[in-house]
């Protein structure tokens, strides 16, 4: 209907348990919203949003849509082109920042997958300070072609680990909690 590029509408919609519409917000993520996670912090729940394409950001929000913090490319990681933290152009390069999803750490920090950009996994502390990165572009152990999603495996009876989906390689790669490569599981057609 001629509105394909319209970006002035919400991207997050809230419904109650009876499927009744409650509210909508998040227009700032329209055209690039990708990953969204809910995290319990004390007595409150928060939304963590990863947005790629021209949006190129990640944010923490209240369940009513108030921004707690909003961040762009972690330039201190050394993996991004100069100016990537202010760019709004769609760049599908390994020096671009195109985040896809989060995984949460017990210390209040989190991991962020740059699944369409540098293919790095970034670790942030509870105050949203960049701590470290692992992964990156490649075909070998510990490298990715589309580090799309991630999860912290804390199942009972197992040593905690970080599991990263690599969609282009159809694999799950497993890392210890310091981001050191452990093993690859193949053949998933992810």
Where are these regions (language model features)?
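Beta-propeller domains
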Residues: 1-26
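Conserved beta-strand positions in repeat-built beta-propeller and related beta-rich domains
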Residues: 1-6, 49-53, 112-115, 154, ...
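Beta-propeller fold detector
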Residues: 23-26, 68-84, 131-136, 183-187
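A short loop-to-beta-strand structural motif that recurs across blades of beta-propeller domains
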Residues: 9-13, 56-59, 119-123, 171-173
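Beta-rich, blade/repeat-based domains predominating
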Residues: 8-10, 29-45, 78-109, 139-161, ...
């Amino acid at each position: 209907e001629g509105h394909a590029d319209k970006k002035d509408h919400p991207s997050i919609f809230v419904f109650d348990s009876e499927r009744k519409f409650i509210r909508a917000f998040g227009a700032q993520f329209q055209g690039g919203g990708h990953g969204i996670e809910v995290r319990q912090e004390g007595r409150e729940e928060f939304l963590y949003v990863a947005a790629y394409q021209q949006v190129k950001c990640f944010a923490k929000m209240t369940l009513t849509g108030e921004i707690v913090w909003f961040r762009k490319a972690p330039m201190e990681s050394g993996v991004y082109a100069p100016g990537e933290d202010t760019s709004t152009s769609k760049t599908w390069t390994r020096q671009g920042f195109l985040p896809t999803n989060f995984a949460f750490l017990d210390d209040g920090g989190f991991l962020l997958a740059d699944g369409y950009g540098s293919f790095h996994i970034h670790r942030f502390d509870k105050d949203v300070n960049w701590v470290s990165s692992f992964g990156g572009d490649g075909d070998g152990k510990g490298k990715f072609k589309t580090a799309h999603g991630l999860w912290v495996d804390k199942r009972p009876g197992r040593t905690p680990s970080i599991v990263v989906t690599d969609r282009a390689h159809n694999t799950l790669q497993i890392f210890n909690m310091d981001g050191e490569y452990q093993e690859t599981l193949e053949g998933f057609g992810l």
